[in-house]
Amino acid sequence: MATSAVVNCLGGVRPHTIRYEPNMWTHTFSNFSIDEQVQGEYAEEIEALKQEVRSMLTAATTCKEQLILIDTLERLGLSYHFETEIEQKLKEIILHINREEDASGGDCDLYTTSLGFRVIRQHQYHISCGVFEKYLDKDGKFEESLSSDTEGILSLYEAAHVRFRDETLLQEAARFSRHHLKGMEEVLESPLREKVQRALQHPLHRDIPIFYAHFFISNIYQKDDSRNELLLKLAKSNFMFLQNLYKEELSQLSRWWNKFDLKSKLPYARDRLVEAYIWGVGYHYEPRYAYVRRGLVIGIQIIAIMDDTYDNYATVDEAQLFTEMFERWSMDGIDGVPDYLKIAYHFVVSAFEDYERDAGKLGKQFAAPYFKQTIQQLARAYNQELKWVMGTQSMPSFQDYAKNSEITSCIYIMSASVFHGLESVTQETIDWLKNEPNFAVSTGMIGRYWDDIGSHERESRGGKMLTAVGCYMKQYGVSKKEAVRKFREQVEDLWKDVNKGYTAMTCMPRETAVLFLNYARMCDASYTENNDDGYTDPDFSKRKISALFLDPLVF
């Protein structure tokens, strides 16, 4: 609910202040203590089952068998246990494909060709979409006879979502497969029906791996008559091990967050620690990335306090003072600065220092200066946006707003906040990101455009009218409906750029490339489902939080 604007002591007008919903998880995780015996039992069982799965990988001989097993491991959230074995199998498959000139490695059915194409691209190997030409009729359309192959059509649909901009064949594959899946989803039997419905809402390539793993284990695989009981048992034990690990991390982070007591000191700001942590598991869910998850929580909480201070409370004059404090990175010369700004600034600096200590422990001290620079960069961008919103500067062109949005998408600060937790990150990685590569910009703008689509009406009702949608409508004289349609098209094109950029990033370790891909996935999954972000709206995230962190899987 928006409040009326008020005049403050510096003579400026405050923005309409949004009263956010309270935190629904305040005490849920803070007192959690992990049962080391239970966790140890899960770990022992996982290790024993892993040996049997390695034997399965070795025993799989045909390309089809190998691809299905790799895909199943990835859907179940187990592939991180077998990274070396999977990469070796994929290299063998690619060699076979190059000999056969067929993405199925000689198993010439639509399902296997599509599966091979998608998995190979998702692992950053080159493969041409020409492998699908054999399924086209004389007019260049997909043969209608394929529509009776439900699993094949679904596999084609999933493959179409790793396409690049210039791949019109895959554009047609997406249209063709979606049309037929929509027509059959209501008559399919469970669990295939649920699998198709999930794909239509969240194509697998755009889904968040750990979210999908929970869905696949609970709703698909354990109901599949052809399931492998060994894989199912490993998947359930692995998920419960991860769930306990996440609760332990949340307990530690809750204590870290609560010590600042910003809920009472800065009541205008969002109190969303658990929602921030969900982004952490979305970025990298594997156990070895604990510092990635912790770093992202620190980064997101910094972003939220800064965003809500600029966007939801500060006057233009106060925001300028706030920005200058970040530029100086010092409490010196802040006499006359309102207390709430001192509190907000002190939190940001303290949180940064916690990050800096973590970076030192990990031997990644070089990451801290860039993280600091992204905080200062974000302050300048938020300050500029507030001047536009409050009318102290004329409304920007769509191009000027979009350029500022590259920063307020938070792709740079969020990436910087986790770099110390990636073993492969070096100073060269940071230098690469400083050059604003198209791959990073494209992932950031997916999030920014989805946010603008979802927030246009909400922010307009709150008394503000500065979104990319609003700028586009004004500059080009189009309706909101037309602007939103254009933005959705732009998101689709950006995904094609992300796919191409991801596949081309072979000079950088895959864990870094996946980081940016997962940012886009988190944004896409949030906004396509709800037209709002899962951080601000606690009800939207409640179901995901319960499933990932609280509800046990049924064995």
From Swiss-Prot:
Its cofactor is Mg(2+). Mg(2+) 1 binds at D307, D311. Pathway: Secondary metabolite biosynthesis; terpenoid biosynthesis. Binds 3 Mg(2+) ions per subunit. Mg(2+) 3 binds at D451, S455, E459. One of its GO terms (molecular function) is magnesium ion binding. A motif (DDXXD motif) lies at residues 307-311. It comes from the Eukaryota. (2E,6E)-farnesyl diphosphate binds at R270, D307, D311, R448, D451. Keywords: Lyase, Magnesium, Metal-binding. It catalyses: (2E,6E)-farnesyl diphosphate + H2O = tau-cadinol + diphosphate; (2E,6E)-farnesyl diphosphate = (+)-gamma-cadinene + diphosphate. It is an enzyme of class 4 (lyase). Sesquiterpene synthase that catalyzes the formation of sesquiterpenes and sesquiterpenoid alcohols. Converts farnesyl diphosphate (FPP) to tau-cadinol. Converts FPP to gamma-cadinene. Tau-cadinol is the major product. PANTHER family: OS04G0344100 PROTEIN-RELATED (PTHR31225), SESQUITERPENE SYNTHASE 31 (PTHR31225:SF253). The Asp-Asp-Xaa-Xaa-Asp/Glu (DDXXD/E) motif is important for the catalytic activity, presumably through binding to Mg(2+). This is Tau-cadinol synthase. It comes from Lavandula angustifolia (Lavender). The lineage of its organism: Eukaryota, Viridiplantae, Streptophyta, Embryophyta, Tracheophyta. The gene is CADS.
